[in-house]
Amino acid sequence: MGCHPVIVFDNGYKKRVNRPMANNNTTKKTWLKRIAIALGTLLLILSALTSLGLWQMNRFVHTPADQSGKQQIIIIKPGKSLKGISRLLAHKKIITQDILFRLLVRHRKMATKIQAGEYGLSASMTPEQILTILVKGQVMLHHITIPEGLNLEETAKLVERAGFGTRKDFLDLARDPGFAEQLKVRAATLEGYLFPETYFFRKDTPQKKIIQQMVQRFNVVYTPQWKQRTLDLGFSAHEIVTLASIIEKETGNSSERPIIASVFHNRLKRGMRLDSDPTVIYGIPDFNGNITRKDLQTITPYNTYKIKGLPAGPIANPGKFSLGAALFPAKTDFLYFVSKKDTTHKFSKTIQEHNKAVRRYQLGR
């Protein structure tokens, strides 16, 4: 039992007074104060951690993993997850932390926008730059140069060596009349229409698209003015392409193209055979590099020693200058030419002059 204070009055009357209890409000205030301090401390800690996290993220986003890093080929396969992509980049040491990269991607809401493909990435790039490249699909482009004068077979081999599919598939497409019709080429094959130039393609570019781009380039070069010139000369576009392909194969020195073109135009006007060795060679399966008298006597749709006029079609893919020469030949009376074995030719107006040139430059007499 506890003691309680007693009040004694003058008349001797005593009254017991209860001891006052602790103030409830004071207790509540104390607890609230403690909670406030705890929450404040927690908020300060969270704020500090947030600031630290934001600083770390900002530093990660804008800092390359290695300023001296060299470019690496990174292949993002279709359907690859964000986790897989970030781990691949971290494994290749393109980025320092895969988790932070995933946070960056998700924060930017770009997880579904990363495009598959072959990329040239480097640790000298910032994660932000890397993400931009992946989202924009700025994949590596591989170049392939098609020289003037290659035929379909040679072009197909070049495409295969460059890693853009097989030679067979390329030839199947290029020789498909239906595909040629789709491309609005009025010919059975695309021989002559795969324009010689340097092209840039993604590694996974289908051959169909490669061929389409080559034909589109031909259509750009063969301008409306050239089409009108073709009509003025009385030729079809296919005939001009055929003639240009012969000029391309006969030319060793580019300055001679218009003169060589004039020889063929002059012979066509006179009803003479073109007598062009490259046309004979084109018509010989598995030509071994040595043209023989038998070859010259063998009748094929391409042997211009045996047939009059142009061969059955182009024998190669001519470049712009050969097409231009076919449309705008030099004005000459030449009917013959023979190689001087130095990339140039000796041009002649008569068979007598030509035979003399042959003896001098070919027979050494």
Describe the predicted segments one by one:
Residues K33, I45-A48, K83, E153, ...:
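Hydrophobic alpha-helical segments
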Residues S81, T145, L158-L171, F179-R365:
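Bacterial extracytoplasmic/cell-wall-associated proteins, especially those involved in peptidoglycan
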Residues G53-Y222:
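Signal peptide-directed extracytoplasmic domains
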Residues L42-S47, I73, H143, Q228, ...:
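N-terminal hydrophobic or amphipathic segments with adjacent small-residue motifs
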